[in-house]
Amino acid sequence: DLIKGNSQRYQTFFTKGCKCVKCGIEGKYFAKEKDLRAKSYHLNLYAVDDDGNEILMTKDHIIPRSKGGIDDISNYQPMCELCNKAKGNTIEN
């Protein structure tokens, strides 16, 4: 199965790196995965914490869409899932 390599997430990791801007954990490997409802596979980037737990790396909106942020590479940053959930729809300095 082919995987499209032009997603916003992949572009974010390629241009801005694979390290969470908040906690500094770094994505180490991609896993080919498929959501139960999806028709095609995608790659998820994972970091591994000191206890060996996998942590999904995400594309965060610096200015959340709910606050007027745009869907553009200039408004994206790499962030681990835990930090992204904690940030929610806030704007950090």
Where would I find each of the regions flagged by the language model?
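Short Cys/His-centered divalent metal-binding micro-motifs
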Residues: K28, D72, Y76-N93
